[in-house]
């Protein structure tokens, strides 16, 4: 909350976002291919930024300055419901000694987590340090740092099936969508939410904002214009293009891979 206040005064953009970068040189941030993921709980920020093929900068809060982006948190807070190693290998392997499980049912003498058990709540979570992710920027001179974003991804979980799976936004449309923050509250993300509910959360982080959303929107437009940063909208929810079912994670991962390669190949 303090960073949302202070960084804005310093003309730095504090964001509710995750970030990763390519496996390029640690010693030259100018060679980085950095992706920022914006989105509310349940839209896929943690899952998609924890990519075995890329380096995780941070999970939830970043600041975009005149020199690039930096992470302001030292760990991750991942949803665990129906967690499977085949779908989310890095997060699955991070659930080990030293991590903290929340609302997760454990069984047997070895306290084995039962990730499919939602008898307490669907909002099962795990907190773990960044160092538990093998490909994370958690140590060294450039720990938690990245260059200017090469691409930004707005993650929205559209429960109405109105949005396409992927689209490229103009700068003006990007700012408008950023200010609107259209998404859905997912089951288990808040007390009493048992099915997807359409909602709007300004800047994809309304609970954390201190200033009027337009301050953050103005800073975002300034930065994406200055650095020619493309902004993509990715729907991780439901789509009529997919037969009215939720878009599978494997499809979304391929979209993110396309976005990263699209920018690199331009």
Regions found by a protein language model. Give the residues of each.
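Hydrophobic positions on the alpha1 helix immediately C-terminal to the Walker A/P-loop
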Residues: 48
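Walker A (P-loop) phosphate-binding loop of P-loop NTPases
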Residues: 42
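Conserved lysine of the Walker
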Residues: 45
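Cys/His-rich finger/ribbon microdomains and the adjacent scaffold used
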Residues: 56-57
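Glycine-rich, often acidic-flanked micro-motifs
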Residues: 16-18, 22-39, 51-52, 63-266
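N-terminal pre-Walker A segment at the start of P-loop NTPase domains
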Residues: 1-24
